[in-house]
């Protein structure tokens, strides 16, 4: 087992923005273009923890299946303790595993805002506007060269394809949303109070993906072929003719793989694998529309100028992450949104 640290290296050297305002009388017409979300790239050279979870739990399930098959096989042949898949050369019994993994992601949310502010009095003004958001993201990652014990996993999925057990993710996402914005500003004496509220931005990201995921469905057939081949050799070495050895091997294999315990264990392995795989990359299936809302945002600020050359500002920011819909309603796992003070 190779110890892994899942460390992401982010790169966002510059986040530019462009602002424009035209003031006339009591009116101010304003526009801006900026990156309102994302704004960079991140690379995980050892992949993600969710990828390792798939491999680790698959390894444990594979070892459990190997133990069950060997126990049933030994009892069927009258040789308790017989080992075929639990040897150190195969899956082993410890649940050890190894693999290579990588993940790279990029997110850019481009925002174009337009709005107008009106000065109702020398003390009070208000703003209303809207921001159009275009989201563009890309994710690429893989899990390859998976081994359980000393057995490459592809050998029990499709021994003719070395990449049969590989997981590969390559997905582009894009979507559009709109954000209504309101704000107020009030001044009195040396004090200045302001507030801004940005409503939740509903975005549905459309996936365009070319992904690869292994299938456990072929596991019974491939196990059957391996068992028949190995048992045929065992029976031939005991003096049977090749024809008889193959026939007995086929019958024995059929009896083992249709055993209730083996069938149940194999079904559990498939269900576990499919579930964990969907949790890890189901969000990136081709053609799928994924919820990726930008949370509502409240900003409150207070400024005080004891003298003309000094100003003290304090601010409060609230991001309502709890109610911004995301894939599989992950936001419901949050206790609350994000609070910031400055």
Which residues are covered by each model-predicted region?
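Outer-membrane beta-barrel porins/channels
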Residues: 15, 21-342
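Surface-exposed strand-loop-strand hairpins of Gram-negative outer-membrane beta-barrel proteins
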Residues: 1-11
